[in-house]
Regions:
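Active-site-proximal or metal-binding-adjacent scaffold patches in catalytic folds
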Residues: 1-99, 108-153
Length: 153
């Protein structure tokens, strides 16, 4: 009976861990430090207004996707930005990873809009305008186009 109580307590304690620990996600990569990049971009582009966000590497799938590649996501309700761990490689330029992180951070500050058909639009004109302000925007777009196949099967 005492043993069952201990297991129950462990389950309860586990659910209180921060989200990235619950999911087994890492902040530090082999080549890039996401927290350092987030802090740098937050200061430079957002006046340190993005507070309480966690930035983590997502889970690495065994196989790369066949048709499309998601570089990053933001889960605003939990304030978690996930970056695809396939980007933590030596051949990925730092400025490209900064661009991906900047893109996800923009989602936290530029509001979504509802379209006429009732669907949500996250890449609004305002979002796209602000995204183009990123110093390496054109270079990052070109690099993505030229290197996307490296991330697909």
């Amino acid at each position: 009976m005492a043993r069952r109580t201990i297991r129950t307590k462990r389950k309860i304690a586990r659910s209180r861990l921060p989200l990235q620990q619950q999911l087994g996600l890492d902040i530090e990569g082999r080549y890039f430090d996401l927290r350092g990049l987030f802090n740098k971009l937050n200061a430079r582009h957002f006046g340190n207004r993005l507070r309480g966000y966690k930035v983590v590497w997502g889970r690495k799938r065994r196989e790369r996707p066949k048709e499309y590649f998601i570089f990053g996501t933001i889960q605003e309700e939990d304030r978690v930005i996930r970056i695809n761990p396939w980007l933590d490689q030596r051949f990925v330029p730092l400025w490209f990873l900064e661009y991906i992180l900047y893109h996800e951070m923009l989602h936290a500050v530029v509001p979504d809009k509802m379209r006429g058909d009732g669907r949500r639009c996250v890449h609004t004109d305002e979002f796209n305008r602000r995204e183009r302000e990123f110093r390496f925007y054109k270079r990052a777009q070109r690099w993505e186009e030229e290197n996307l196949a490296r991330f697909l099967r």
